[in-house]
Amino acid sequence: CRLGAMSVTVADVVAALEAAYPPQLAESWDKVGLICGDPDDGVSRVAFALDCTLEVAQAAVESQAQMLVVHHPLLLRGVSSVAVDTPKGKVIHTLLKGGVALFAAHTNADSARPGVSDKLAELVGITPGRPIKPVHLDGIDKWGVHIPPADVERVMAALFELGAGEIGTVSYTHLR
């Protein structure tokens, strides 16, 4: 999105969603990301839903949304055709004819911090913990930090308290 121009594109929305819910956090079987639509199309209205059913797609078109963000992917498995005479094909064609791009954030949104699982935990009064299956993303899971010798123990204790230094079931890992 260019500042001052107010022209947000599908690609801009995708970039923001992928920054919050990195695709690398998705399970290997999951199908997340932009499902249909032109990344260069403009977006001024975004609709959100749990699932992209035909009714949801029609509502997104009727509301003049240019993008629909869902949790559950429409094309998760078993789809060999998106012809208009198939159930999922009818949904895709409805969106495309209505100028609505479709994006899914599923297990990546579940695993992100904060993410869907954190919010659900909060709603039932549970303090969110850590992911059941931590995923380490390239570029953000290794740190090189120079600390004055007098402060090493205090800084390391604070980092470990926040979960740094965990590899699988082993905690407090570090190199000096």
Language-model-derived ranges and their functions:
Residues 3-176:
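Hydrophobic structural segments
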